[in-house]
Amino acid sequence: MKKLFLILTTALFAAGFASCTDDPEETVNPVVVSEILRALGGNVLVNVPEENFDVNIPADAASWVQINEAESSGKALVLSVDENETGTERSTVVNVTRSGKSTVLATVTIKQSDITLQAGEFVIEEIYFTGTAFPETGKPDRWLGDQYIKIRNNSDEDLYADGMMLILSSGLNSGMNSEMIEGKDFRKECCAGNAFYCIPGNGQDVLVKAGESLIVVNNAQNHTIGNPNSWDATKADFEWYDVSSNENYLDIDNPDVPNLDKWYASTLTVQVLHNRGFNAVAIAMPPVGLTAEQFLAEYPLEDAQYIFHSPNGSDYTLPLRNCYRVPNEWILDAVNTGCRDAYYIAPWDASLDAGYAWCGTADGDADRFGKSVIRKTGSDGKLIDSNNSTNDFESNTKASLIK
C-alpha cells in the first residue's frame, strides 16, 4: 500500500508540475510607439508595462539604434537614434518582450529622414535687393551692402537652421526675354544657381524658435554712417563674405557677425543680390554630411540651354554656364523675383513658385530703391505660403528694416 501511495503521489505531483509549466503567459496589451525623427536623430521614450523586459533591435539597425542606458530606468526605456548620414530615409521596428519570454510588451516603429528640415518649415520672409539711395545722388552705392534676406521659422516647433543653403542667385535671369527648350526644362528636377552659401553649425548650434527669424545680410555694417537713409546691419545673424580676386573690389567683413560658409559663387569679386531681382533666391537643406567639395563634384548643371529672344528679332540658343543644381526635393522655399513689367521667365519651377514678387514697375525704375518684397501674414499669425509669390507677397513695399 505504501508503494502504491508513493507512486500515486509521485504521479500526481508530476502531473501538477506539468500543469503549472504549461500555463500560458499572462497576456498584456502591448504599447505601440511610432516615432518619426529628423536626420539629426535623438531619443525615443517607451513606457513599458513591466520592469523586466528584453529589447530586440534588428541586426540591420543595431548600428544606429541603441539603448540609452543613462536615461533608461524602471519601466522607462529610452532608445537613442544616431544621426542619419546615409543620404536616404531609413526605418526599423524594435520589439520589447517580457524578460526571457516571447510576450510582446511594446512595439516601437522608428522612421528617420535623411534631412533635418521639411519644405515650408522655414520660409523666405523678406528679400531686400534694391538697395538704399543716397540723399545726394538718388542712387545706392554699387556694393549694395545693406541688402538682406529674412528667413522665418514658420512652424510650431523650435528648429535648427545649421546647414541651410541659401541660393543667392538663380542661373536663369527673369529679366531676359527667353524660354526653355521643349523637353529640356531642367527646372522640373532642380534649381540652377551660381551662388551658394550655407549657415554654419554642427547640427544644433543655430536654434530658431517657432515664429522667429534670421537676418542674413550682404555686409554687417552700420550703413547709416555713410547713408542716413539706410539701416544698421551690425545686429544681423549672419553675413555673406567673399574674398575678392580684384583689389579694387574688396568685401568688408564684420568679425562680430558670423559669415556664411561659402560653397561657390561664379563671381570672382563680391556677390550681391541682383538689384532688380532678376536672379531669384531660394533656401534649401542638403542631405546631412554633404560637403561643399562633394556638392561641386556631384551636382554640376550640365548641357543646360535656353532660347533667348533678342531685341533684333533673332532667337539664340544659349548655354547656362557656371551653374550647379539643387534637387527640388532639397528646397525649403523658393521665390521668383523681378520687375513687374519686365518679367519674362521663371527661374524656379512652378511647383516651387507659380508666381513672382517684384520691385519697380519697369527695368531701371528708380522708384524701387528702399523697397523690398515682404511675405504676407495670415489670420493665424503665420506667414502665407501657397507657393505662389504673386499672391503670397506684398511687392514693391517699404523695406521693414529701413526706418
Where do the language-model regions lie?
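Bacterial Sec-dependent N-terminal signal peptides
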Residues: M1-L40, L45, K101-A119
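Surface-exposed binding patches on compact interaction domains or structured appendages
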Residues: V48-V78
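Short, hydrophobic/aromatic beta-strand segments
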Residues: N52-P58, D158-I167, N177, G226-N227
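Short, surface-exposed loop/turn segments at beta-strand-coil junctions that are enriched for proline
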Residues: D82-T88, N222
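A short beta-strand micro-motif common to beta-rich folds, especially ectodomain repeats
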Residues: T88-G100
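A structural motif detector for short, solvent-exposed N-terminal "entry" segments of globular domains
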Residues: S113-G175, A265-N279, A284-F308, N312, ...
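The feature marks short-to-medium sequence segments in extracytoplasmic or secretory-pathway proteins
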Residues: M164-Y197
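Solvent-exposed beta-edge/loop recognition patches
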Residues: F186-I402
